Structure formats: structure tokens, C-alpha cells
Amino acid sequence: ASSDGKRAFWRSGSGRVIVVDLPTYETRVLPGAPADTLFRLSPDSSQLAFVRDHDLWSWDIGAGKAQRLTKDGSDTIKNGTLSWVYWEEVFGRQDIGYWWSPDSKSIAFLRSDESMVTEMTYMDFRPEVPRLIKQRYPKAGTTNPVVLLGIATIGEKGVTWAKTGEEPAEYIVRAKWLPTSDRVSVQTLNRNHDRLDLWFVDRATGEGAHVLT
């Protein structure tokens, strides 16, 4: 359910996403694809964000229209979802890599470029017929994905990229909107894990103000 308690959604067995207005029980069906994933309602329940083919989208529930917020998603570029190393080591096996602003106007998200990460192949023995799985897996000491923090604003084109000192940061380990919605607090970590920096990133410009180390 949305944080304002006005709407909720669920996924049907056929893969459709149904949004329900809790006061009236009126329902709407998201005109999407079964592969759409990682849905999250905006705080004011007016929008439903999701990931489609590694791109971040938002559906205006009232207007019934979807907006594609990123346009470079691919097998090696992930927007709004996490690469394996971030999923496993940084965000505690959480899949979603995006966050609504409190005023529901913008989404901060992670963009992961895995093109330089070695692809590993392993066998999945869980199905009745075993299958091969290919996964971008950075072994210790090898290249990690290049991760950027972007800010997409509903109804506007393009993405504002966060600027936090040397670009790109070796790791972006936390991102959280300030209550005013004008800035995102971002924590960056170096690969040696001995320097953690806190930045406040301006929503409009992407400029990062260094707060502390």
C-alpha cells in the first residue's frame, strides 16, 4: 500500500498488476508486460514505478499513462535494479535500487554498468531439468560494475546525475531523500572500505555538497 493509505496493488496470476483505490475499491489494470517487475507506489499514491527491460518507468494512475524515465537499459546496463554485488554485499539482497522523493515528484535510482564485469556460468540443479545460468560476477580484485546515482523527475525528460567528488564513486552504499525532497543524502565508500563519505545531492543540479567523512 502507499504511505498515504489511499491505494494498494497486487500482481495477478497472469502477471497483470491491479491497482485498487482503498476508499472506493475502484480498480485499474496496469497496461504492461508480464516481465515488468519491482513495483513501488509513490508516497501520494498518484504514480506506480516499475522496471521494464532494465529501464525505470512510472505509471500515472489517474491518467493511465506510462513514462519511460531511462532509455539505455540492456543486459549490461541496469536502471533501478541492482547488480549482483550490490544485491548480495551492499543492500542485503534487496532487488529494488530506486527511491521515491517524499513529494512524489522525483525518483533517485542506481544505474549499474556491468559491461566490464566478468561473466560466470554455473549450473542450477533445482529444476527437474538442470539449466545453465550466466551471471556477471566480479571476483575479488577484478572489475566491479560502474554505478551512478541518477535523479529522474516525473513529467520531465532526461536524468540528473549526482556529482560526488571523483567520478564514479567506487561504491554507492546508501541513498535516502531528505524530508524536504530537494536533496538526496548519498553515502560513498572506497574499495578498501576505510573511507565513507556523506553527500547531500541537489535534486535540480546533481551537485553534491560534502557533509562529512
Regions found by a protein language model. Name each.
Residues S2, S42-D44, S101, L178:
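Structural WD40 beta-propeller signal
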Residues A8, S45-L48, S104-I107, D182-V186:
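Hydrophobic beta-strand positions that form the internal "hydrophobic ladder"
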Residues G13-W57, A63-G97:
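Asp-box/WD-like beta-propeller blade repeats and closely related beta-sheet repeat scaffolds
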Residues S14-V19, D53-W57, M116-M123, V146-L148, ...:
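Structural motif
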Residues D21-Y25, I61-G64, T153-K157, D202-G206:
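Short loop/turn segments that connect beta-strands within beta-propeller blades
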Residues L30-P34, E89, K163-E167, L212-T213:
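Surface loop/turn motifs at the tips and blade-to-blade linkers of beta-strand repeat domains
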Residues L69-W99, S106-T164:
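Predominantly five- to eight-bladed beta-propeller fold
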Residues S185-T213:
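Extended hydrophobic/aromatic segments used for targeting, binding, or gating
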